[in-house]
Design a protein with these regions (language model features):
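Glycine-rich phosphate/diphosphate-binding loop of Rossmann-like nucleotide-binding domains
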Residues: 186
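Thiamine diphosphate
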Residues: 1-156, 160-161, 170-175, 181
Length: 186
């Protein structure tokens, strides 16, 4: 899903000179292509997630379209206060991408696992939460998120990268994804 996500982000950045990607020393393999095409718009702040959020907030206040990326527990749990105070209370158009939801990185231990992220993010003000489950949904989410001018949080799984749905499905922000129309509830 990360590579689908990045390809959509590259398409967007090609048309939008204010699009920036900020990472905290992660995502090199996934974002190598973005960094090569847009070296001046790819920022690595080092292992400093709180500063990453602060930098992103400052950039957004100057009109930049900022995407921040890290492993999910790092970008969310370590930076929650900065996300809440700097991004959400100012309703800044920043997209927070957390990779490896759930137990995707279980080999690295408890510091890399997340099972609480959806409940935490859903309780925060001014935040749209996306949780794609396939490559198709990841592509759909990027396009929905780009139309959304408010803060967004995207939970990307590490694997599997397979599609479950028909590619002709359509979805709008804050609406469910209708798989099949029917008259009975199961």
């Amino acid at each position: 899903m990360r590579f689908i996500f990045v390809n959509e982000l590259i398409k967007f950045a090609s048309k939008n000179k204010n699009a920036y990607l900020v990472t905290s020393d992660l995502g090199y393999r996934a974002f190598e292509k973005f960094a090569k095409i847009f070296p001046q718009r790819f920022l690595n702040v080092g292992v400093s997630e709180n500063n990453m959020i602060g930098v992103a907030a400052g950039m957004a206040m100057t009109g930049k379209k900022v995407f921040v990326y890290s492993i999910l527990p790092f970008v969310l749990f370590r930076s929650l206060e900065q996300i809440r105070n700097n991004i959400l209370h100012n309703n800044l158009d920043i997209k927070i991408i957390g990779a490896g939801g759930g137990f995707s990185y279980n080999v690295q231990g408890i510091s890399h696992n997340t099972s609480e992220d959806i409940s935490i993010t859903r309780s925060l003000p001014n935040l749209s939460v996306y949780n794609p489950g396939s490559r198709f949904e990841a592509k759909l989410v990027v396009n929905l998120m780009l139309k959304n001018k408010t803060p967004c949080f995207v939970r990307l799984g590490k694997a599997p990268d397979r599609d479950f749905y028909n590619k002709n499905l359509r979805c709008k922000n804050n609406e469910g994804l209708i798989l099949t129309k029917g008259k009975e509830l199961t």
